[in-house]
Regions:
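Catalytic Walker B motif of ABC-type/P-loop ATPase nucleotide-binding domains
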Residues: 151-155
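H-loop (His-switch) and adjacent beta-strand-loop-beta switch element
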Residues: 195-213
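Conserved ABC ATPase signature
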Residues: 126-130
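Helix-to-loop junction immediately C-terminal to a conserved catalytic motif
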Residues: 48
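H-loop/switch region of ABC-family ATPase nucleotide-binding domains
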Residues: 186-187
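Conserved ABC ATPase "signature" region
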Residues: 104-122
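Helix N-cap at the start of a conserved alpha-helix in ABC-type nucleotide-binding domains
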Residues: 162-164
């Protein structure tokens, strides 16, 4: 469980989000939405522990879990001489001995991850040969094989086509059904309404947080 006690996200002393109070329950699935520049990605980085809160408190109960993280802008350079399988296997590194290498179970997990995103046939291709959509699928497979209890996704569908977006969305739903907690920054209101039970909507002054349907209804009323 993640508890936000008057949490304000931002950079240094510059507050970007309003103060947030609430709880993200273990096993929940939450979309963070709002206009560009309202602090969605900043909040997600704060929840992940990459940024300290400007003010307020972030509490983990019972303790901070391992996080599967998919950034909006990846830091992995496609010029590196890595294969698709190399990158996906990085998700298993926390559970792998440096001296023993990848055991059968880990190799099976990597193969499953590649299969789930439709990249099994490209496992040994170097990453500089991938299209943008294939690259995003590879990074998502890395998160999937990690099997972290908490998964944070920052704009996972940016720059990819509809078919790839839906493929990844189906994998996110499966991860949630398996008991993983999902927090995702999204712009796609249709997918939020269809798949995410809980929504946190940010704007410059206030936040709406709760079941997706009521939050969406309030937003439509404000826009009318």
């Amino acid at each position: 469980m993640i508890e936000l006690d008057h949490l304000v996200a931002g950079y240094d002393r510059l507050a970007i989000t309003p103060a947030l109070c609430g709880t993200l329950a273990r096993g929940s699935m939450t979309a963070i939405v709002g206009a560009n520049g309202c602090g969605k990605s900043t909040l997600l980085k704060t929840l992940a522990g990459f940024l300290p809160p400007v003010s307020g408190v972030l509490r983990w109960q019972p303790a901070r879990p391992t996080i599967g993280w998919l950034a909006q802008r990846h830091a992995l350079e496609s010029q590196f001489p890595l294969t698709v399988q190399d990158v996906v296997s990085m998700g298993c590194w926390p559970r792998v001995s440096l001296f023993r290498g990848l055991n059968r179970d880990v190799r099976s997990r990597i193969a499953q991850g590649l299969e789930r995103v439709g990249l099994a046939a490209m496992a040994r291709e170097t990453i500089d040969t991938l299209s943008g959509g294939q690259f995003q699928r590879m990074l998502f497979a890395r998160v999937w094989v990690q099997n972290a209890p908490l998964v944070m996704l920052d704009e996972p569908f940016t720059g990819i086509d509809e078919a790839t977006s839906q493929l990844l969305m189906e994998q996110i739903v499966d991860m949630h059904r398996a008991g993983q907690t999902i927090i995702a920054v999204l712009h796609d209101s249709e997918r939020v309404s269809r798949y995410f039970p809980q929504t946190l909507r940010l704007d410059e002054r206030v936040a709406q947080w709760g079941a997706t349907a009521p939050v969406a209804a309030k937003d439509e009323a404000c826009s009318a």
